[in-house]
From Swiss-Prot:
The lineage of its organism: Bacteria, Pseudomonadati, Pseudomonadota, Gammaproteobacteria, Thiotrichales. The active site is at 79 (nucleophile), 163 (charge relay system), 165 (charge relay system). It comes from the Bacteria. It holds the Pfam family SNO. Belongs to the glutaminase PdxT/SNO family. It comes from Francisella tularensis subsp. holarctica (strain LVS). PANTHER family: PYRIDOXAL 5'-PHOSPHATE SYNTHASE SUBUNIT SNO (PTHR31559), PYRIDOXAL 5'-PHOSPHATE SYNTHASE SUBUNIT SNO1-RELATED (PTHR31559:SF0). One of its GO terms (biological process) is pyridoxine metabolic process. The keyword Lyase applies. This is Pyridoxal 5'-phosphate synthase subunit PdxT. InterPro entries: Class_I_gatase-like, PdxT/SNO, PdxT/SNO_CS.
């Protein structure tokens, strides 16, 4: 069976995720409307600005459809996408996780760091990245940076505080496809 990955495309860095999956030979659908969810098997919620993303989800009336999809299908949230999936007022509240927005600094404080994932070193690109501060016991920590979790999984949901789509390394995207 061929998988079709949806990439939420209403705000943020969705095109880089789409390009990464296409480079892996995966069919990609840019998700902008409620009916777009019906033709995908899994979804990426990209980075961007979480408050703007929430406003647009509500403006375009896709918040409920997004919630229903993410409750049962594989989903991958990067940076702002991880914030939207976590606990918080107005968020999807699907992860036993609390985040601190912009915890690694402002845009000017962006950095690149090597992190270990699945016995391999990968590059983490941190841009106004959130910090995962309260991680529930249902959440698996897959990778850390300076003792702080940066890549997590809870059941069907994968989240990263960094941007794996901004590298040439498909390791995290391949992991998501195998979930």
């Amino acid at each position: 069976m061929t998988q079709k990955v949806g990439v939420l495309a209403i705000q943020g860095g969705y095109q880089k995720h789409a390009d990464m999956f296409k480079s892996l030979g995966v069919e990609v659908k840019l998700v902008k409307f409620n009916n777009d969810f019906d033709s995908i098997d899994r979804l990426v919620i990209p980075g961007g600005e979480s408050t703007t993303l929430l406003n647009l989800l509500n403006k375009h009336q896709i918040f409920d459809k997004l919630y229903n999809f993410c409750s049962s299908k594989p989903v991958f949230g990067t940076c702002a996408g991880s914030i939207i999936l976590s606990k918080g007022e107005g968020y999807l509240n699907l992860l036993d996780l609390e985040v601190q927005r912009n915890a690694y600094g402002r845009q000017v404080d962006s950095f690149v760091a090597d992190i270990s994932f699945n016995d391999k070193n990968i590059t983490g690109v941190f841009i106004r990245a959130p910090k995962f501060i309260v991680v529930g016991n249902q959440v698996d920590i897959l990778s850390k940076y300076q003792n702080s979790p940066v890549l997590l999984r809870q059941a069907n949901i994968l989240v990263s505080s960094f941007h794996p789509e901004l590298t040439q390394d498909p390791t995290v995207h391949e992991y998501f496809l195998a979930m």
